[in-house]
Amino acid sequence: MISVLIPMVGYGQIVADHTVVDQFDDIPQRYIDAVKTMLVCMAGESHSMGYQNGQLLLEKLDPTYQVETYTTDPPPAYSNQYLRIGRPYMMGEDSFFSPAGLYLIKQAVADQNDTGNPFDVMGFVWCWDMTWENPPGGTMDPVYRVRWAGSSEGSPDGNKRWGLDRGDSILTGNRVSMDTYLEGVDAVIRYCKDLHIPTQWIYNTGPVDGEEENGSEMGFQRELKHDHIRAWVAADASRILFDYADILCWNNDGEKNMAEWNDNGEIRPHAQIHPDNLMDYDESFNIIDMVNDTDGDHIGEVGALRLAKAMWWMLARIAGWDGNGGSTG
C-alpha cells in the first residue's frame, strides 16, 4: 500500500484550478499507477456527485484513468487497479460549523485508518452553503460593501447568514464564518499529523451555479468567500486547494465567464459557471444540451469531466509528481 507523500514546497504549491485541466494527460505512468492505489473521500451533499460523475466520464473517454466510485460505508477495499473516489456518507456544513461535527470528522478519519485501508485524500465538498436559505442581509460590510448570505445548519448560533471572519459576527449575528471552515481543516490536518495518520486533507472552493446568484449581490459575496479560501491556502505552501469554482468558471477554450452585479448603478463583476459547463456529452463525446440534471450534481457532464481531469493532476502531485517530468521524492 502506498503512503501519501507530503508535498514539497520547493516544487510549487499544489493548486488544482483551471490551468491544470489540460495537464492530466502529462502525468507520467508511475504516478498514474500511484493514483490507482488511492482511496479518496470527497464528502458532501448533491454537488459531491460531480466529483464521481466526472471520473466515470473520464474513464469512458480514456480507459487509462480507471476508477471505482462509491457511496457506501465501508468504502472499497484496497486495490492498485483503479482510483477509488466517492463519499461513504453525506456531509453538510454542520460538519465544520460545530465542535461536534468536527469531532465526528476526526473520528471518521481515525476509524478508517484503523481498518488498514486509510483515506489517502479527503476534502469537504461545499453545497450552496455560501448562498442559500439566508439571502444577503444583516449589516452592510464596511470593507467589501456587501451584505452576507449563506446557511449554517447545526452551528452554535443556529442557521444564519455568515461572513469571512470573526469580526463579521457583529454584521451577521453568527459566530460562524469562512474562517471556521478554514481553521477546522487546519485542525484535522494537525490531528492526522499528530497521530501519524496518512490522510491528506485538502481545501475546496464551492459551487458557482445557481441562476439567482448570476449577476447579484449573492453571487458577488460568494466570490469574496472563494477568494478568502484562496488567500488562506496561499499563505502556507503546504496547503492544497482543489479550486472547484475556478475550474467551472472557465470553458475548454480558455474563456472565463463573468457576471455583472448592478449595485445601484455601480457594475461589480464576479465569476459564474461557464454555460459550456452546464452542457452534456453524447456517446461520441460531442457537446449537447443538458435536458435535465438526472445525475443530480447541478452541473453538466462537460463541467464534471473538467473536475475529473484536474483531480487526477492533483492526486498525482500529492503522490510525488512535480508537475513536469520529475518527482518530489
Where are these regions (language model features)?
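Histidine-centered active-site loop/cap adjacent to the catalytic His
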Residues: 241, 264-326
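Conserved SGNH/GDSL esterase-like catalytic core that processes O-acyl groups on lipids
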Residues: 47-171
